[in-house]
Amino acid sequence: MYCSMPDGEVENKLQDVIDRKILDTRRVFFSEPVTDKSAADAIKKLWYLELTNPGQPIVFVINSPGGSVDAGFAVWDQIKMMTSPVTTVVTGLAASMGSVLSLCAAPGRRFATPHSRIMIHQPSIGGPITGQATDLDIHAREILKTKKRIVDVYVEATGQPREVIEKAIDRDMWMTADEAKDFGLLDGILFSFNDL
């Protein structure tokens, strides 16, 4: 008797096996925009690794165009609370909130692959903005607070003066991995995971 599974089930089972194998190596891949869902998925995986083997290193691989600041800082805060040392590795792209996530590792643990790109900029509000003047003023003050938090992260991570960071993020600032290293966003360029 022959029993076949629908293609979707086969793909899902294969994806589960791949995800399990990767998690067994204590690697978490974040290869999507930063959303509430992607942040929650990453946090669950990170905490699974933390709880199953506390204090053992975790590699957080980032390839993200950025996205939600709040969701990104949720991941950031969780990583900072763990006992397991986290190493970040940018591969492909870490833009906007993705670049902030790449800095959640302790100094000496922030890397990128040779052809990666990093983009930093100030936060923005998407879509048309409508509402009463008072509400718009509240939103404007909130985005300025968010900008300050992001500037604080970049200043602490890079050691650059606040004025340099504020000027750098005034518009999109694109960097190669080497340029990001020179700017202080990375500690090194990673040519092999064996180098970790």
Swiss-Prot record:
Upper lineage: Bacteria, Pseudomonadati, Chlamydiota, Chlamydiia, Chlamydiales
EC number: 3.4.21.92
Active site: S96 (nucleophile), H121
Keywords: Cytoplasm, Hydrolase, Protease, Serine protease
GO cellular component terms listed in the entry, alphabetical order: cytoplasm; endopeptidase Clp complex
Organism per entry: Chlamydia felis (strain Fe/C-56)
Catalytic activity annotation: Hydrolysis of proteins to small peptides in the presence of ATP and magnesium. alpha-casein is the usual test substrate. In the absence of ATP, only oligopeptides shorter than five residues are hydrolyzed (such as succinyl-Leu-Tyr-|-NHMec, and Leu-Tyr-Leu-|-Tyr-Trp, in which cleavage of the -Tyr-|-Leu- and -Tyr-|-Trp bonds also occurs)
Name of the protein this chain belongs to: ATP-dependent Clp protease proteolytic subunit 2
Family in the record: Belongs to the peptidase S14 family.
Pfam short name (any one): CLP_protease
InterPro entries: ClpP, ClpP/crotonase-like_dom_sf, ClpP/TepA, ClpP_His_AS
GO MF assignments: ATP-dependent peptidase activity; ATPase binding; serine-type endopeptidase activity
Free-text function comment from the UniProt entry: Cleaves peptides in various proteins in a process that requires ATP hydrolysis. Has a chymotrypsin-like activity. Plays a major role in the degradation of misfolded proteins.
